[in-house]
Amino acid sequence: MKLTRRSILRASAFAAALPALSRVPLSSAALAQGAPDGTWRHGLSLFGDIKYPADFKHFEYVNPQAPQGGMVRRVAIGTFDNFNTVVAGVKGSLASGLELVTETLMTPALDEVSTVYGLLAEAVRYPEDRSSVTYRLRANARWHDGQPVTPDDVLFSFETFKANSPFYGAYYRHVTKVEKTGEREITFTFNGTGNRELPQIVGELPVLPKHWWQGTDKNGNKRDVTQTTLEPPLGSGPYKVKEATPGRSIAYEKVADYWGKDLNVNIGTNNFAQMRFDYYRDSTVALEAFKGDQIDFRTENRAKDWATAYDFPAVRDKKVIKEEFPVRNTGMMQAFAFNIRRDKFKDPRVRRAFNFAFNFEEMNRQLFYGAYQRIGSYFQGTELAATGVPQGLELEILQAVKDKVPADLFTKPYTNPVNGDPNSVRDNLRQALTLLREAGYEVKNTKLVNAKGEPMQVELLVEQPAFETIVLFYKPSLERLGIGVSVRTVDSSQYENRLRQWQFDIIIASWGESLSPGNEQRGFWGSQAADIPGSRNLIGIKNQAVDTLIERVIFSKSREELVAATKALDRVLLWNFYVVPQWTYPFQRTARWDRFGHPETMPKYGQAAFPNIWWWDKDKAAKAPQRN
């Protein structure tokens, strides 16, 4: 999968498509970068200049002579029962890998921040006030059945996603009109001006074949884009579904006559003949499958396993390679997240008390071998993270919402409580109890009760047995406060359904953030999204100050303003204690059977970029064990 802004943002849906640029030559004059004055251009950047000129041959980080062929066996956790990306996050469990089939208008470069180049679109233009954007499709873009990709397909895709996906409904809420404005042109009109992001994020739209979705299947039944389906989808991308067993495996094969194989942003990518995803119940089972050479490549998210589980013969014999890749392209909030739609979590003092009870330091020592850092920002590890006390432009922005935010955020830096030794634990539990009493609770007969005498009971909902260890470690600290705690583990299908309907108290959730946040923040934290089932506002935040700051982020006129506005948003979210932050690690941990090659210089913002820019190495494969 290629890491893109959208794939970072959409944890529950499919990632953006793999890249491309034209086989049909365009003049440099026609695609000059220029100012935003209606000039056709080959790429877009939110801030600053783009790196690659109109006539570039390929991205610098790829191997243009990469060998072709071979198969990659990859892992997926849980199950799947759906190939329809439109209803992802709303209905069913989406199959892994569908980003290989579906393409977008534009595609990002992995060595630039917030820069995209043409994929299905050969060129893009917008007026100086950014009140609209027009994309011109490539004349040679084709669906796998040979039919051309048309503006009607783009219009159909936009209307379908916006009507049926909470994510896209929020993401594209400022688009008021979409119309065909030329034989190969499609224009999106916005309800305002000055939104720097809108012309670019429209290019992230996955494009679907209108004629296929409005047709019938092999049994003569009319397809319904609003429902789940296990019929392999028609796409325009470099791969198509070869075979699938619902809930167990799905295999993709390279499209022999793929229209975009010679595009310059595709050179050096899509090198494998086949890709296969095998499904496992949880990460522990998947690890054993990897050890048994049933999986080729694994991303390891558990510090304990990274430290202890990779001491097996194939690692010692260098047949399995462990390698870490720096994470520079995303900030991440991973946390215990409250459902503040429920009365017991509406008071921020209650939520803050839960943070005082979380002994991260001891958990890090016992469970994670000291590998992790505590998260202290929704944009952890980036220049967007709030630090210290607000100053300069950030302070000026916060003054506009001064009466709607906690006063402490102006004079105190946000910090998580530090535990780890008996005295600290005792002091923090005492502070937690003080906060709970201020919120109207008291301890009676070892139970925490509210003013009505009702006991505080919470359920920690998880979807993988591996998470049970984490929540069971947290549970005794909460019980020491008199809180009744239950832990419930459900399968992925049940878990998704409960989240869509907000049927939970506390979950482990994560929100990936790009280096250029924007419209998606409405879906994460905006008041309107709080009432939309299936939205990413899992917490249920309805906060006027947050809404105001989200709009300031979206309509920032410079990188400086964007950074300051995002820091302000981050600070307000932190000081409302909507979550108990967990932990992070600044590298992507990977393990692979030594059958593959990758470029010597990896893209700065691509992490491992597997399998996008990797290839099958016949010489290495010959020395590796024969696959089972």
Predicted regions and their residues:
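N-terminal lobe/hinge region of extracytoplasmic solute-binding protein
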Residues: 34-129, 156-159, 234
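Surface-exposed binding/hinge segments that line
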Residues: 136, 170-218, 236-245, 389-402
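Ligand-site clamp/hinge motif
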Residues: 138, 227, 258-310, 352, ...
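Aromatic- and charge-enriched surface segment that lines or borders ligand/interaction sites
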Residues: 62, 66, 89-96, 123-167, ...
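Extracellular/periplasmic solute-recognition and catalytic clefts
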Residues: 177-180, 242-253, 278-342, 349-353, ...
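Aromatic-rich, solvent-exposed beta-strand/loop patch
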Residues: 118-122, 144, 149, 189-210, ...
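Gly/Pro-rich hinge or "lid" segments in bacterial periplasmic/extracellular proteins
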Residues: 96-114, 159, 203-276, 281-285, ...
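Detector for C-terminal structural segments
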Residues: 8, 14-15, 26, 35, ...
